[in-house]
Curated annotation (Swiss-Prot):
InterPro entries: DapB_C (IPR022663), DapB_N (IPR000846), DapB_N_CS (IPR022664), DHDPR_bac (IPR023940), NAD(P)-bd_dom_sf (IPR036291). (S)-2,3,4,5-tetrahydrodipicolinate binds at H161, G170, T171. GO terms for cellular component: cytosol. Its main location: cytoplasm. This is 4-hydroxy-tetrahydrodipicolinate reductase. One of its GO terms (biological process) is lysine biosynthetic process via diaminopimelate. It is an enzyme of class 1 (oxidoreductase).
Length: 275
């Protein structure tokens, strides 16, 4: 059995991950971490998420070193500030990591990856753990590779629930980065307003829409003079992300020390390798 600690266990994603870890025959939930100010501290996580008693109490981040003694991997779906503080603690305690938090700057990622590498553990870091979204990444790569030199413009539209705190989504930014990489050029434009003039050939438009309880929609458009291609992924449940996180957890505990992406999990290799 693979021992799992869930960081952000009482959040939207954390609750789903805890439930799915409990249901998975290869995994064992050994720790549930929540904010130091959480009203659920000290309660059985199973009672909080509605699955009955589990014997696992919700604990603050200060409990990580002790909980890590019985764990193999930490799954972190929290917020930028919490991950930057707690993920290095988990790594120094010897835990491999699966990080699905978004909202990092490039410098944040450099610092985080350095801490993980210094600790000598393995980590999967991805803005979206959904298996379908990671296939969308690969299809977008092919789309840009084939059409990029044929006069097509690329635009990205993402839609999320009204509670999401960062925009555009990490997934949309990753899609834009993939297009930039394949084109060898690109300038992200975040929405348009006023007299902006004609579209520049290097632009990659990124539009964020917020409202309702949309789990997450992402559309990549390749717009040519005579035709348009759209690739769309719609998440129907947060379980799509939780399922991917569990797949990543099973991968990372067997992987050599280093930094991995979901591309590596699905297609093999290490960051920068694969398809």
């Amino acid at each position: 059995m693979i021992g799992v600690v869930v960081l952000g266990a009482t959040g939207r994603m954390g609750r789903r991950i805890c439930r799915m870890v409990i249901e998975d025959e290869e995994l064992e939930l050994v720790g549930a971490i929540a904010s130091p100010t959480s009203k659920h501290l000290g309660r059985d996580v199973g009672l909080v998420i509605g699955v009955g008693e589990t014997g696992v109490e919700i604990a603050p981040p200060t409990a990580l070193p002790n909980i890590a003694k019985d764990a193999d991997v930490a799954i972190d779906f929290t917020v930028r500030e919490a991950t930057l503080e707690n993920a290095p603690k988990a790594a120094r305690a010897g835990l491999d990591l699966v990080i699905g938090t978004t909202g990092f700057s490039d410098e944040d990622l450099r610092v985080l990856e350095h801490e993980i590498e210094e600790a000598g553990v393995s980590a999967v870091i991805s803005p979206n753990m959904s298996l379908g979204v990671n296939l969308l990444f690969e299809l977008t790569r092919q789309l840009a590779r084939v059409l990029g030199d044929n006069g097509f413009d690329f635009e990205i539209v993402e839609i999320h629930h009204r509670h999401k705190v960062d925009a555009p989504s990490g997934t949309a930014l990753e899609l834009a980065a993939i297009i930039e990489e394949e084109l060898g050029k690109g300038e992200k434009v975040f929405g348009r307003e006023g007299n902006v003039g004609p579209r520049d050939d290097d632009e990659i438009g990124v539009l964020a829409v917020r409202g309702g309880e949309v789990v997450g929609d992402h559309t990549v458009m390749a717009l040519g003079e005579y035709e348009r291609i759209e690739l769309t992924h719609r998440a129907l449940s947060r379980d799509a992300f939780a399922k991917g996180a569990l797949v990543a957890a099973k991968f990372v505990v067997e992987a050599p020390p280093g930094i991995y992406s979901m591309r590596d999990v699905l297609f093999g290799g290490k960051r920068g390798e694969g398809l």
